Amino acid sequence: MALRKRSPHGLGFLCCFGGSDLPEIDLRDSHPLQYLEFSGPIPNPEELNVRFAELVDELDLTDKNREAVFALPPEKKWQIYCSKRKEQEDPNKLATSWPEYYIDRINAMAAMQNLYETEDEETDKRNQVVEDLKTALRTQPMRFVTRFIDLEGLTCLLNFLRGMDHTTCESRIHTSLIGCIKALMNNSQGRAHVLAQPEAISIIAQSLRTENSKTKVAVLEILGAVCLVPGGHKKVLQAMLHYQAYAAERTRFQTLLNELDRSLGRYRDEVNLKTAIMSFINAVLNAGAGEDNLEFRLHLRYEFLMLGIQPVIDKLRQHENAILDKHLDFFEMVRNEDDLELARRFDMVHIDTKSASQMFELIHKKLKHTEAYPCLLSVLHHCLQMPYKRNGGYFQQWQLLDRILQQIVLQDERGVDPDLAPLENFNVKNIVNMLINENEVKQWRDQAEKFRKEHMELMSRLERKERECETKTLEKEEMMRTLNKMKDKLARESQELRQARGQVAELVARHNESSTGPVSSPPPPGGPLTLSSSRTTNDLPPPPPPLPFDSCPPPPAPPLPPGGPPIPPGAPPCFSSGPPPSHDPFSSNEAPLRKKRIPQPSHPLKSFNWVKLNEERVSGTVWNEIDDSQVFRILDLEDFEKMFSAYQRHQACMQEGPQRERGNVRDGGAASRPLPAVEASAHRTEKASRSMVSATGAKKELGSTEDIYITSRKVKELSVIDGRRAQNCIILLSKLKLSNDEIRQAILRMDEQEDLAKDMLEQLLKFIPEKSDIDLLEEHKHEIERMARADRFLYEMSRIDHYQQRLQALFFKKKFQERLAEAKPKVEAILLASRELTLSQRLKQMLEVVLAIGNFMNKGQRGGAYGFRVASLNKIADTKSSIDRNISLLHYLIMILEKHFPDILNMPSELKHLSEAAKVNLAELEKEVSILRRGLRAVEVELEYQRHQARDPNDKFVPVMSDFITVSSFSFSELEDQLNEARDKFAKALTHFGEQESKMQPDEFFGIFDTFLQAFLEARQDLEAMRRRKEEDERRARMEFMLKEQREKERWQRQRKVLAGGALEESGEFDDLVSALRSGEVFDKDLSKFKRNRKRPGSQVPEVTRERAINRLNY
C-alpha cells in the first residue's frame, strides 16, 4: 500500500495540534519487496478512463481533486489503477478488508473493558485494532465505508465512547476512536450519517472530559469543522449544552475557558490545545447563525466575556505563537467590528455595556417618540415590582426575565431559535414551586425582627460605652501631650528668662558707667521683652523707664546687642525722633545684573505670552540665581525653530481657544462650619429640626411616637409653647430616648457618660427656652403635671442655672478637637508648601529652562527677561507647534527635560503639599481661628462665673471645664504660633519668586503651581500615549506583513503539491476544512476586510480599539 500524503493545508500547522506525527510504518509482510509490474498492457484511452472513473468514484474525491487526477497522463493513471486493484486483491489483507471484522472486535472490547484490568500489552493490541480501522476508513474504497455505515458501525463507535471506563478514557484508544469518527466524516456519506445521528455530536463532545490533550484537540477540531458544515452549527451548540449537564458545569463553555487559562507545563501540547480552543470559539461565533446575525454574535460572545475570556486572551499573547495570535487577532477584530456596528445603530462611537445608565439612556432616546415607548414604561414599571431582597427565588425570577429577552432577540422571522440555551431545561413552574412558603417566611421574619431590636438596643448601649471610653482616652492622651509640651515650654522660657535678666543687669551696669544722672536700663534690642506666662512675669522687677535718647546711632554702629553679634538688618530701629531709614525688600547692594546674551533665531518664532518681571524686582529672588545662558548651549535651537516657526499658520496658533481650565477647587472655606457655642442657637432655623422626623419608634417608651400621640389626645394637657416648635422639640426628645431628668443630669455632669452626641447637642441648642417662654412657664409651674411634653422639658431645663451658657460650653468642648483638626492641616499645608517651593532645586532648574526658551522666542518688550511672573507658567501650553497642533510648548519642554535634564522630571515629588495648600483660603482660615478664640474666651467667662456660685453636688462644670481650658488654651496657642509662622514663610515664598505679598493669597499662589504640575503630568502622559500608539501601529504593520508573507508561502506550497501529482493520496474535504480552521485560513477573507475598513480615512475603529483596551479590565 502506497503511503498516504498529508493534506497541504495542514503543512506547517498540524504540528500545533499534535496531528503532525508521521504514521508508524510496520512491515510485517514476509514477502520480499518487489518492483511493481503491470498486469497487462495499457488499455485504450476510453477503457482506461472508464476503469479509472470507477476507482475515483470509490475514493469519493472532491470535484477539485477529481479534475486534478483526470488530468494525469495515461501511464500515471494505469499505474495508480493497477496499484489499487492489487492492493484490494491482496489475500493477506482479506480478513481486515471487511468492516464486520472491526465492528466485532470493537464490540468485544466494549464488553470486556469493565470485566478485568487490562495490561499494557493488551491495551496496545486494542489500540492497534482501532488504528487499523481508522486507516481503513481513510484508504479503503467507498464500498467499505458504505458497508461500515450499513452495519451500524457508527453506533458501535458511539456506544464504546459512551460506556468506556476511566482508564480507557485516558488512554490512546480514546484518541484513536475520535480519529475513526473523524476519518468517517472525511467523505460526504459518512459525514451525513454522523450528522443524522441525534446524539452523535453530543457523545463526541463528552470526550472533552479527559486529561489527554491530544484527545481534546481532536474533539475540538471535529466540533469546529462541524460548525462550518451546513446544519452543523446548531448541533454543536446543543452538544455544548449537553456537555454542560454531563460535566456539571455552572455555565456553558466553562470547561473550555478553564482549559484556555490553565497551564499544562509542556509548551507544544499547551499551544496545540489553546489554538484548537480558540479556533473552535471563532468557528462557533462566526459560523452558522453568526455569519449574518449580529445579535447572535453579541449574545454568544457575551457568554465568553462573562466567563472572563478577555484577560485570558491578553495572557495568551505571551506564547508568541503565530497561529495562536492569528486566532486571537480575529476574535478581537470581529468583536471590535460588532461593537462598532451596534454603536452605529444608536449614532454612537462606543457603547459601554457595563454601564446600565448609558444603555438605558440609549434605549430611552431610541423609543421616546415611538409607539413602543409605553411598552418600555410598562416594562420598567413592572421591573420596579420585581423582588429585590436576597431571599426566596428572586434570582431565578430575574434570570427568567433575562432568558426570555434573550430568546426574543435570538428568534428569527420564522420563529427558529439558533441557540436553545436561554430556555433549555428551564421550567417556570418548577422555579415558582421552589419559593419558600410564605407563612414560614413570615414566622422567621418576626423572630428575626425581635432579635434585631434586641441587638440594636445592646449595640446602642455598647456604642455609648465605647464613646465614653474613647472620649476619656483621647482626653487623657491630649492632656499628657499638653503637659509634656508645657514642661518643655516652661523649661525653655525659664532659660530665656535667666538670659534676659542677665542681659538687663549688664545693660544697666553699662549705662550707669557711661552716663551721669539717674538713668534706667533700656529695653532689650528688638522690642520690649515679652513672656508668654503671667506667672513668670510677676517675678520680674518693674521695668525702668526708657532712656531719653535723642536719636539712634548711625547704621554702621547699631546699638550693642545683649552679649552677642550686632542686630540683623531686619531688626526694628531704636526709638528715634528722626525718620527711620527706608527699607525696600527688593533693593540690594549687589552687583548690577549681567547683560543677556541670547542667540537669535534665523526666522521669526511664535511668542511665549509671559508677563516679564521688572529688572528692579529681580534682586533677592530666585531669578537672581538663574543663568539661562547655560541652557542655550544644550538646546537644539534648529529643531526648536522648526517646531515653533511663526510662518506656518501663525494666526491660527495664536488665536486658539482660551486656556483649558483646571478643576481645582480652591474655595477653602466653602463648607460652612458651626459657630462657636457662644454664638449658636439664637440664629438657627427650624428647618433642620424638621428633618429629624423618623419612621422608627414603635416601642412604647418615654418620648416615643406612640407616647406623643397618646399625650396629644389628653383633654387636660397644658401647652404655652408655639405648636410647631413644640412638635419639633418632641421629635428631638424621642430620638434622644432620655427622660428630662437624665438630660438634666447629663448637662450638669458635662456628659461624662457620653449620653449626648454632638449632633444631638447641636439640636438642643435650637430649643433653649427664651425669656417669654420662661415667663409663661413660671406662671403655670403649679400645673407642671398637666404640662405637655415639650413645655415640661423647657421648664425643667430653665431651672438649670445658666443653661444656655452650659450647653454652649459643652458643645464647644465636644467640637473643639474636631475644629482644631480641621484648621491644623490647612496651616501646615501653607507652611510646608512654602518651604517646598523655596527649597526645590528641580523647580529652579526648570524655571531656568523656561526662561531660556522664552527669551529665545520673544522679541521686543517681552524679550531679554531676567525673570517672569509665576502665573506665566500656565500659559506655556497655549503656544502650539507649527508642525503638529497636538504638540504644545509644554510637550516640547518635557521632551527637552527628558533628553537633557531627566532629574527635573521628578519635580512633583518635591512639591507634595501644593494641592492641599491651593485649597486653603487664608481669610476663611483666619475666620476659623477667630471663632475658636472667641469660643475659648466665652468658656473662660462662664468658668469664672461658675466658680463664684454655690454648686450642686452633681455639678461637674468647674472641674471638667478647668481641665479643658488648660489643655485647649495651650493647643490653641500652638495653632496661632504655627499660623504666624505660615504667614511668614508664605511672605518669604512670594518674595523668593518676585511676587508682591499684598496682591496674592495662598490659594492663588499655590494654585498656579498646582495647576502647572497637573498640566505637566498630563503632558507627560500625552507624550507616553503618543509613543505607545506609534509602537502599536508599527507592531501591527509588522504582523500584517508577516501574515501576508506566510499565506503566500502556504499557497505556493499547496500549488506545488498539486502539480506534483499527489492529489489522489490527499485526505478528504473534511480534513481540508479542519486544516483551514487550524491555520485560520477560513477567516482570512474577514480579516482582510476588517483591516481594509480600519485603514479607511475617517474610520473610527482605532477609537473603539482604545475603548476596548479599557473595557478589557471589566471582564
Swiss-Prot record:
- Which stretches make up the DAD domain? 1065-1095
Give the record's keywords alphabetically. Coiled coil, Wnt signaling pathway
Q: What's a Pfam family in this record?
A: Drf_FH3
A molecular function (GO) held by this record is: actin binding
Q: Where is the FH1 domain?
A: 518-694
Q: Which family does it belong to?
A: Belongs to the formin homology family.
Q: What does the subunit section of this Swiss-Prot or TrEMBL entry state?
A: Interacts with DVL3. Interacts with INF2.
**Domain comment?**
The DAD domain regulates activation via by an autoinhibitory interaction with the GBD/FH3 domain. This autoinhibition is released upon competitive binding of an activated GTPase. The release of DAD allows the FH2 domain to then nucleate and elongate nonbranched actin filaments.
Protein name (database record): Disheveled-associated activator of morphogenesis 2
Source taxonomy: Eukaryota, Metazoa, Chordata, Craniata, Vertebrata
